[in-house]
Regions:
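Short amphipathic alpha-helical segments and helix-helix/interface helices
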Residues: 22-26, 62-63, 99
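Extreme N-terminal starter segment of soluble prokaryotic enzymes
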Residues: 1-4
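Short, solvent-exposed loop/turn segments at secondary-structure junctions
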Residues: 11, 41-43, 116-118
Length: 149
């Protein structure tokens, strides 16, 4: 059972009709856990997405995630030197909690293809924080493999 940090970008892809995004969320719901921050910034972002999209599949996914107790919580604060470094790279401040929980999580997996995750940012996250930023196709393949590494 892996711990996944899922950027809201993935939820918006589901709303756009991306079947890989939907398959990924369903695989995570069946076999894995989703990482949230104790401060609830990520949950608030998810709720904003659900409110904007009014997508019943996303709403049901989120309800089932809670019912299945498939959430795990970590601090959403990054050490300040990493926060400063990312902000210098023009990384969006609202995405910092996602990076922070990915950093603290067991598997250090973050799924996003958002433009904030430039090659430079992804390199920094991998080298300095051991956080691996995965594309949707990479994440789907890994999520469907239910064996832990």
């Amino acid at each position: 059972m892996r711990e996944w940090t899922i950027d809201t970008w993935v939820l918006y892809k589901v709303d756009e009709g991306d079947f890989d995004a939907l398959d990924f969320l369903l695989a995570v719901l069946r076999h894995h856990r989703v990482v949230f921050d104790c401060e609830r910034h990520i949950e608030q972002e998810y709720q904003r997405c659900l409110k904007r999209t009014r997508n019943r599949y996303l709403e049901e996914w989120f309800k089932r995630l809670i019912a299945r107790q498939a959430r795990v919580f970590y601090s959403g604060r990054l050490p300040s030197r990493h926060e400063r470094a990312l902000l210098r790279m023009k990384f969006d401040r609202s995405d910092l909690p996602f990076v922070a929980v990915a950093f603290r999580s067991k598997d250090k997996l973050l799924v996003s293809e958002d433009s904030d995750y430039t090659q430079h940012v992804c390199g920094y996250l991998q080298q300095q924080l051991q956080v691996k930023v995965l594309s949707l196709s990479q994440a789907l393949k890994l999520a469907e493999d239910t064996q832990d590494p």
